[in-house]
Every structure is written in structure tokens, then in C-alpha cells.
A protein has these predicted regions:
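Low-complexity, Ser/Thr/Pro/Gly-rich disordered linker/stalk regions
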Residues: 17-173, 187-188, 204-262
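Short polybasic amphipathic segments
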Residues: 158-160, 193-196
């Protein structure tokens, strides 16, 4: 029965799949140490790895089959991305981020940025700090978690989708619940749309389209987390964030959690 189910899932994924422009699913990596093969002088692999703390790569990024969304049979493993008090890069912000290494046109026409995200029950993220997640440098669209500047109160456990700094969708982020996300970005018409599901459920259009200044040079989307400091309300201790099924496609949107064959 398992074999039949896997075959059906594969066929469904194949039928619905678009064209993968960039594959960031970690399928070809043996460990996170492979990230250190990349440098500005030697731009190899699928990720640029330079936004992190001073520790070893294993302090900030680790890979394992147990870190992926188990509903995604197209991904061999997922990533645990950690931020802590040592994860500072050119500021007092806590940051561990990976950037696509590609010459593909991931900033042209209509493209779909896929990823799944969760946190666990260990090293739980601080709800009193603003987290910018899977963002573009111009912040025309991104996720946020925790208390966001301008909100009332001192904490917020919602995961929010933002467009130009404005919240367009939110849900409580519970431990060990996968949130599957697609940013549908039309760089030609300057619009963004949000697709979402949980667990192994099919993605559905959830919010948008909204007009936005969709500016990107093709090397400024950050997979990972940036945490802003907040005097008097800073959380303490490391935070673990999990990412799975990361890729960018064009053409027909893959709405299945089962990511397609590259």
C-alpha cells in the first residue's frame, strides 16, 4: 500500500509541477558543511552562506531527514536554522540566512517561491522579539513572527504574512505544525499573492493579490531568520527554526506539498 500511495503522490506532483528555476531542497548536500564550500571567489552550490555568526556552520545550520516535512517525499532532508547570541552579522541582530546561488531568472515574470516552516518544542522562538523570515532585502514581502513594532502589548505568537510592512494574513504558530508557504510574485505587474496550507494538505490561495514594489536583483531573498533586538523585552537562549521543501518555480504552480522532480 505504501508503494502505491507513493506512486500516486509522485504522479500527482508530476502532473501539477511547473519548471524548477532554483532548487534549494538540500537534496544533494551530505551535511551543512557543504555550505562552506561557497565563497565570493568560489560561487558553488545552491546557496550563498555568509550571513551568520562567528561559530562553526554546525552551530547555525544542520540538515537531517527528520527536519523536513514528512509529507514532502520530493525532499530528502530539511534544515534546522539556529540563531543565538553569537549569531550576529554586522549588527546586534541575530541572523542566520541562506541566499539562492543562481543565475536563473527568479526575479522575472511570474514565479513561485516555495518553503515550509515550523518550530519545535526545544529552543522555542521568543514571542517578544520581531522576527523577519524568508524576506527580500526591500521587504516587499516576508513573514514575521513575534511582537512587531507598532503593535500593542509585549508579545505575539502569530506568524504573519506582510506586504510592504503591512500584515495581510496571520495564524498562531504552534509547535511542530508545518506551515507550507508560496509567495506568488508577478514582477511584471508588481503584485504578490500568498498560498498556504498546513501539514501535508494542498496549498490554497489565501490572500492577495496585492500591489507591491516587487524589487529584487535575484540574489536578495533570504531563507532564514533575522531577529531584531528589543531593549527590556529580549528573549534569551537559542532559537531553532525548521525549513523544508525550498524551491522556486515558474509556469504552473505546484500546489501539492510533494515537491516535484528537479
Amino acid at each position: 500500500m505504501f508503494g502505491k500511495t507513493a506512486l500516486v503522490n509522485a504522479l500527482v506532483s508530476a502532473v501539477s509541477a511547473g519548471t524548477i528555476l532554483w532548487d534549494g531542497r538540500f537534496n544533494e548536500m551530505s551535511s551543512s558543511a557543504d555550505l562552506e564550500k561557497w565563497s565570493w571567489a568560489n560561487q558553488v552550490g545552491n546557496y550563498q552562506y555568509y550571513i551568520h555568526g562567528s561559530g562553526a556552520v554546525s552551530k547555525y545550520v544542520n540538515l537531517s531527514p527528520s527536519y523536513k516535512n514528512q509529507g514532502d517525499t520530493g525532499s530528502k532532508q530539511g534544515a534546522k536554522i539556529t540563531i543565538d547570541s553569537t549569531a550576529k552579522w554586522n549588527s546586534d541582530m541575530w541572523r542566520t540566512e541562506l541566499i539562492p546561488q543562481t543565475k536563473a531568472a527568479i526575479n522575472k515574470g511570474t514565479v513561485f517561491y516555495h518553503f515550509s516552516i515550523k518550530h519545535g518544542t526545544t529552543n522555542v522562538p521568543s514571542a517578544t522579539n520581531e522576527h523577519q523570515i524568508c524576506f527580500f532585502e526591500s521587504h516587499f514581502t516576508e513573514l514575521k513572527y513575534g511582537w512587531v513594532n507598532g503593535e500593542s502589548g509585549t508579545s505575539n505568537t502569530n506568524l504573519q504574512w506582510m506586504v510592504g510592512g503591512q500584515s495581510k494574513w496571520k495564524v498562531e504558530l504552534k509547535a511542530d505544525e508545518w506551515h507550507n508557504v508560496v509567495y506568488e510574485i508577478n514582477f511584471s505587474s508588481n503584485q504578490v499573492t500568498f498560498w498556504h496550507s498546513t501539514g501535508n494538505n494542498t496549498l490554497v490561495r489565501t490572500a492577495g493579490p496585492f500591489s507591491s514594489s516587487t524589487s529584487s536583483n535575484g540574489a536578495d531573498w533570504h531563507l532564514g531568520v533575522l531577529r531584531l533586538p528589543r531593549q527590556g523585552n529580549d528573549g534569551t537562549g537559542a532559537e531553532d527554526w525548521f525549513f523544508s521543501g525550498t524551491y522556486i518555480e515558474s509556469g504552473t504552480l505546484t500546489t501539492s506539498v510533494v515537491s516535484p522532480t528537479a
